[in-house]
Design a protein with these regions (language model features):
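Cysteine-centered catalytic environments shared across enzyme families
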Residues: 1-259
Length: 259
């Protein structure tokens, strides 16, 4: 079907597994292509709540999922896998969309919640992982890459027009700033933002994280040095969690030489 064709167009992003979630009565369907890094055998997506009312998919990685899982288990929550995506599901069940603030990672997340008749789309704080939305006149579409929209018959027939405003921005700035894309009707979900849809119609957008809102600390240079090294050590440690072999690109610049 169309959803499987959309998912197959992203097989290069997730060559290891495919999952489909379909709620025909509500007109919701989600496809996922998975690159297996955490819990190879038990991380199939979408993750679905025990009552079948909530489904979660993500592209990315939640670096603090081990700590969050331990906290949830201490509160009596049953977690059946080692997957960071299941941790998102269990947190959402308890805290709703506010759970995003608990996540330390790079991610693009879709959460279908039949209880609210709502679909949430969310991106990480600075937008490491991409997420695009498109309204083709009949439905709302979302994907990690724009080309995943092309298998949809209505999109293929209409051949989305070039967005002249986006071209103006490109000629002015030498790039197209978000939320614009080169195509009319195709937009980025902004970093640090979630969007809520009901029956394909947007009903809310909220910035859940903003750098300008972060509190300034009145630290001395020595305090900042200690804080920086502690943060760097912790950031490196939690990014080394994987159930597959991993490597590192060391370019010789300031960042890789520091690590």
């Amino acid at each position: 079907g169309v959803l499987r064709a959309m998912a197959q167009s992203l097989v290069h992003r997730g060559p290891d597994d495919e999952g489909i979630w379909h709620q025909p009565m509500r007109g919701v369907a989600i496809g996922n292509r998975r690159l297996s890094i955490i819990d190879i055998g038990g991380g199939h997506q979408p993750f679905v709540s025990d009552d079948g009312q909530i489904a979660v998919v993500q592209n990315g990685e939640i670096f603090n999922h081990v700590e969050l899982a331990a906290e949830l288990r201490a509160q009596g929550v049953k977690i059946r896998s080692g997957s960071d995506t299941e941790v998102i599901l269990r947190l959402y069940e308890r805290e709703g969309i506010a759970c995003l603030k608990r996540l330390n990672g790079m991610f693009a997340i879709a959460i279908d919640d039949a209880r609210e008749d709502a679909l949430y789309l969310a991106r990480d704080r600075i937008g490491v992982k991409p997420l695009y939305v498109m309204d083709d006149g009949r439905r709302m579409l979302f994907a990690s890459e724009i080309k995943a929209f092309w298998p949809v018959p209505s999109v293929a027939r209409s051949s989305p027009a070039i967005d002249l405003e986006a071209i103006h921005h490109y000629l002015t700035f030498n790039y197209i700033p978000a939320p614009w894309t080169v195509y009319q009707g195709v937009r980025h979900v902004m970093p640090g933002t979630w969007m809520k849809y009901t029956r394909g119609a947007p009903v809310g957008t909220r910035r859940w994280w903003n750098l300008a809102d972060q509190r300034e600390q009145d630290f001395s240079f020595e305090d900042w040095s200690v804080e920086f090294m502690a943060t760097l050590d912790d950031a490196t440690r939690i990014r080394l969690r994987a159930d597959v072999p991993f490597g590192a690109f060391l370019s010789g610049g300031v960042d890789s030489s520091t690590i």
